[in-house]
A protein has these predicted regions:
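An acidic-aromatic loop/edge-strand motif
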Residues: 1-77, 130, 142-171
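Aromatic-lined ligand-binding clefts that engage carbohydrates, nucleic acids, or primary amines
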Residues: 58, 66, 93, 99-121, ...
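Non-catalytic, beta-strand-enriched accessory regions in extracellular/secretory proteins
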Residues: 81-93
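Surface-exposed coil/turn segments at beta-strand junctions on protein surfaces, enriched
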Residues: 82-84, 99-100, 129-131, 143-145
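Short solvent-exposed loop/turn micro-motifs enriched in small/polar/acidic residues
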Residues: 86, 108-110, 129
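Short strand-edge motifs at loop-to-beta-strand transitions and within beta-strands
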Residues: 89-91, 132-136
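Short hydrophobic beta-strand segments in globular cytosolic domains
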Residues: 124-125
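Short, hydrophobic beta-strand segments
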Residues: 138-140
């Protein structure tokens, strides 16, 4: 504690801890409350949500105005410098007839910080943790031949954000 007091950038957090008498239960509760408020603010700023419902997951949504981003990679290195918030990614793909009715494995590599992943407008998974690999299963009942759309809502709360890792980990 005494050492951290000497380091720039810790004063505000240490003052909060002092106010809570360094009680771990109270500190965790305060942290969770602060994080919840912050996430709520992010959601309000998210143009891909309308009345807390995702509007950019529809398979027939026009992508004409969307920009491309090279993945994997942090978005700060791909045109979104110093950005914390929500970014939506979409990818269209063709499902061959031999895959109909079979569960599919989806590997998104690592995502910083959180994601909600949709397949053809249906939420299939949520993940959290900036160094946690995301491997999901697309349920067999959703797998139909033809065009399919994968939409991923990525939230970043600080530092670098995005779908990152190794290219061979995305499949």
């Amino acid at each position: 504690y005494e050492t951290l007091k000497q380091v720039l950038g810790f004063h505000e957090e240490l003052a909060k801890m002092e106010q809570l008498d360094f009680d771990p239960v109270r500190m965790e509760k305060a942290y969770n409350q602060e994080r919840s408020e912050w996430q709520s603010l992010f959601s309000k700023e998210d143009k891909g949500m309308e009345e807390d419902k995702p509007c950019w997951i529809a398979p027939d949504l026009s992508e004409e105005q969307w920009q491309d981003m090279c993945l994997p990679g942090y978005w700060e290195r791909n045109g979104l410098k110093n950005f914390d918030g929500v970014v939506w990614f979409r990818r269209s793909l063709e499902i061959p007839a031999e895959w109909i009715g079979k569960p599919l494995k989806l590997n998104l590599g690592m995502i910083d910080d959180e994601d909600i992943t949709y397949f053809n407008g249906v939420e299939i998974a949520r993940g959290a943790g900036y160094m946690t690999p995301r491997t999901y299963t697309i349920p067999a009942k959703l797998v139909k031949a033809g065009k399919a759309v994968l939409a991923v809502r990525v939230s970043d709360f600080g530092g670098e954000g995005g779908i990152h890792g190794k290219a061979e980990e995305l499949y």
